[in-house]
Amino acid sequence: HSLCGINCICNGSEEHFFNVVESKTENGIRVVPIADKTYPLFKKWYDEGCEYLLHTPDGKHFTYRNYYDSYWTSVMELIGCSHKPHDTRHTCVSMMTAKEVNPTLIKKIIGHSGAMSITEKVYTHVNVKELLEAINRI
């Protein structure tokens, strides 16, 4: 599956995570937990059986630009905001920080390579259950 240009392997519609298998950075290749709150949306998309997790109505690849122009801007106009999709990462990190999620888990979830120490990058191993517990705190 592809998630707006991020190649990933979805581990069946009953799993609450996916694996990013191609990324711009090494830390981008990771397990991404799917929060219980958003799982029904991912399950619906996955169960559509399309090659792409997020896709156009006719099943084609959804580029970032296409998504942004076709959906994001109209939603932002509707609710009177001027946020960019990347702002959701900031919000997610802020919400997890407010819920006192371990900073290493936050970095692993968002794939933030620059802020990780050598210890975090190389020696800190976390499992999917820990990532799910962290994301579900928000």
Q: What are these model-predicted stretches?
A:
Residues 64-65, 131:
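Generic alpha-helical segment signature
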Residues 32, 47-53, 57-62, 69-116:
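Short, basic (Lys/Arg/His-rich) helix/loop patches that form interaction surfaces
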Residues 40-41, 51:
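Extended glycan-interaction surfaces of carbohydrate-active proteins
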Residues 20, 54, 123, 138:
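Short clusters of hydrophobic/aromatic residues that line enzyme substrate/ligand-binding pockets
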Residues 1-38, 56-58:
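Basic, Lys/Arg-rich DNA-contacting stretches centered on the C-terminal catalytic core
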Residues 39, 110-137:
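Catalytic-site neighborhood detector that most strongly recognizes the C-terminal catalytic loop/helix
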